[in-house]
Amino acid sequence: MTTLRFRLLGEPHIEADQRPLTGFISTKAQALLIYLVMSPGRHSRNRLANLLWSEFTDDQARNNLRTALSNLRGLVGPHLDIERDAVAYKRDMPFWLDVNVVRDTFGSRLDKQVISRIDEATALYQGDLLDGFQVRNAPIYEDWIL
């Protein structure tokens, strides 16, 4: 069973069994997969078509969605539940999503202020706490550092 890995914090990178997933027919096809994995639940085809192809007529948008779904079916078919009126990402299939790791760590509220604070903390990190700093004959202090 193929495991998909989604690294979306920063430049998007998607892997299937530890290899880059390639073969997307368009950026919008890739965006559709990203939207589905980040947005649990069933999504109507009309909503998805409007999400990505709102500048087209309804018929053109639905046709573009069909084409993108056909492409995704070939790339990650078992991970998608594609029905006549709705599409969903199957949560019971193996996948890893970096955004979920952050949400689980910091809570589901990732507003701009929280993200800014995470960026600040990341910029401050220069290495392990007191890396290379040693105090001789103070084993309790050294244990505390660890």
Regions found by a protein language model. Give the residues of each.
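Intrinsically disordered, charged and Pro/Gly-enriched terminal/linker segments
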Residues: 2, 22-23, 27-29, 34-38, ...
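Short capping segments at the starts of secondary-structure elements
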Residues: 35-48
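Short glycine/proline-enriched coil/turn segments at helix->beta-strand junctions
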Residues: 39-41, 76-79
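Long, low-complexity, charged/polar intrinsically disordered regions in eukaryotic proteins
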Residues: 1-7
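DNA major-groove recognition helices of helix-turn-helix
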Residues: 14, 29-33, 48-49, 65-76, ...
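Short, Lys/Arg-enriched N-terminal segment that forms or immediately precedes the first helix
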Residues: 8-21
